[in-house]
Swiss-Prot record:
<feature type="domain" description="RNase H type-1">
    <location>
        <begin position="5"/>
        <end position="154"/>
    </location>
</feature>
<feature type="binding site">
    <location>
        <position position="60"/>
    </location>
    <ligand>
        <name>Mg(2+) 1</name>
    </ligand>
</feature>
<dbReference type="InterPro" id="IPR002156">
    <property type="entry name" value="RNaseH_domain"/>
</dbReference>
<protein>
    <recommendedName>
        <fullName>Ribonuclease H</fullName>
        <ecNumber>3.1.26.4</ecNumber>
    </recommendedName>
</protein>
<keyword id="KW-0963">Cytoplasm</keyword>
<dbReference type="InterPro" id="IPR012337">
    <property type="entry name" value="RNaseH-like_sf"/>
</dbReference>
<comment type="subunit">
    <text>Monomer.</text>
</comment>
<feature type="binding site">
    <location>
        <position position="14"/>
    </location>
    <ligand>
        <name>Mg(2+) 2</name>
    </ligand>
</feature>
<dbReference type="GO" id="GO:0005737">
    <property type="term" value="C:cytoplasm"/>
</dbReference>
<dbReference type="GO" id="GO:0004523">
    <property type="term" value="F:RNA-DNA hybrid ribonuclease activity"/>
</dbReference>
<keyword id="KW-0255">Endonuclease</keyword>
<dbReference type="GO" id="GO:0003676">
    <property type="term" value="F:nucleic acid binding"/>
</dbReference>
<comment type="function">
    <text>Endonuclease that specifically degrades the RNA of RNA-DNA hybrids.</text>
</comment>
<dbReference type="Pfam" id="PF00075">
    <property type="entry name" value="RNase_H"/>
</dbReference>
<feature type="binding site">
    <location>
        <position position="14"/>
    </location>
    <ligand>
        <name>Mg(2+) 1</name>
    </ligand>
</feature>
<dbReference type="GO" id="GO:0000287">
    <property type="term" value="F:magnesium ion binding"/>
</dbReference>
<dbReference type="InterPro" id="IPR036397">
    <property type="entry name" value="RNaseH_sf"/>
</dbReference>
Length: 175
């Protein structure tokens, strides 16, 4: 897909860990189908099961996984995140990590490998492009997914569908 061609789906995702590491954490996402238009959004609260600590980076990765869940195979998706870690891990670093047997440049095991591999596998089923947006800088949709993630982490009710639609309109994602 050419770099200047918008994908059919546009996904915004954000994660939050109230105590990093340790949690609890939350994820939030908004997905827009530009062909219909149609909208899907959600938030999930996460606590540790003892296997992995709840961290900001794990929540950011989980938010993207949740956003990509259920999208039709072969479709193009533009994923927008305020996490440079997510964008760089999935669009740059992953190639070197695979070649080095999932080791970093310093020879250490790649953190969050389970989620990165899951996103890589899902990314192979879809055509995913990742882009970064500055967090807490007034982007309406990023602010909404941030609020979804933080509300989920606190176990509180997050933004409503009307709030999500208002943010999408403010960002000129929908009319």
């Amino acid at each position: 897909m050419p770099a200047d061609t918008p994908a059919r789906y546009l996904a915004f995702a954000d994660g939050s860990s109230l105590s990093n590491p340790g949690g609890p954490g939350g994820t939030g996402f908004v997905v827009v189908d530009r062909a219909r238009p149609a909208l899907r959004f959600g938030a999930t609260r996460w606590v540790t099961d003892g296997t992995y600590a709840v961290t900001n980076n794990r929540m950011e990765l989980r938010a993207v996984l949740e956003a990509l869940d259920g999208l039709p195979e072969g479709e193009a998706v533009d994923v927008v995140s305020d996490s440079r870690y997510v964008v760089d891990a999935l669009s740059k670093w992953i190639h070197g990590w695979r070649k080095k047997g999932w080791r970093t440049a310093a020879g250490e095991p790649v953190l969050n490998r389970d989620l990165i591999e899951a996103l890589d596998a899902r990314g192979r089923e879809l055509r995913v492009r990742y882009s970064w947006v500055r967090g807490h800088d007034g982007h309406p949709v990023n602010e909404v997914v941030d609020a979804l993630a933080q509300s989920a982490a606190r176990g509180a009710t997050g933004p409503s569908e009307a709030n999500v639609i208002e943010a999408l309109r403010a960002a000129a994602v929908i009319g």
